[in-house]
Amino acid sequence: MADWFHSALKTCTHVCDFSDIKASSQQDFFCCDSMRGKLSEPRKVLLVSCFVSFTGSFYGSNRNVRGQVQLGMQQDDGVVRPIGYIPIGGYLYHDDYGYYQGEKTFNLDIESDYLKPDEDFWKRFTINIVNDKGLDDRCDVKCYVVHTMRIKV
């Protein structure tokens, strides 16, 4: 990692909005360095970390909701596997709205091979809302994802 210290820093951001929680609440997105055609020399990319934060609400009475925000990444074999989970949930005693929020940074440290100047570095990610208890159409979650990359020529 020390040899990456003086390399350029770049971020890639995404917002995943789940206006209600369904049986399958998943959104796919791509992290990309967007450097195709901007440099004349080959480069390497280090995908340093992924920061995920979320806010959400739920409605009900005497209601206990629990679940997880799952971050997944497509591996080299083409399969999307979980990187980590962030718990979500809360409890209400009366008819009202409840709120939940959370955040976590996942350290990745994934280094690419040398990339040609005419190609982008990219990785496919997913955000999946896992319903452990009570997350349904009366619940919403908005996730914010920030990937941090280093680019070395």
Swiss-Prot record:
Q: Which InterPro entries match?
A: Nanovirus_C8
Q: Which Pfam families match?
A: Nanovirus_C8 (PF05629)
Report which superkingdom the organism of origin falls in.
Viruses
GO CC terms, sorted: host cell cytoplasm; host cell nucleus
Q: What is its main location?
A: host cell
The UniProt keywords, alphabetically, are: Host cytoplasm, Host nucleus
Where does the UniProt annotation locate this protein?
Host nucleus; Host cytoplasm
Similarity annotation: Belongs to the nanoviridae nuclear shuttle protein family.
**Function statement:** Putative nuclear shuttle protein.
Q: What is this protein called?
A: Putative nuclear shuttle protein
| Organism the protein comes from | Subterranean clover stunt virus (strain F) (SCSV)
Lineage, uppermost ranks: Viruses, Monodnaviria, Shotokuvirae, Cressdnaviricota, Arfiviricetes
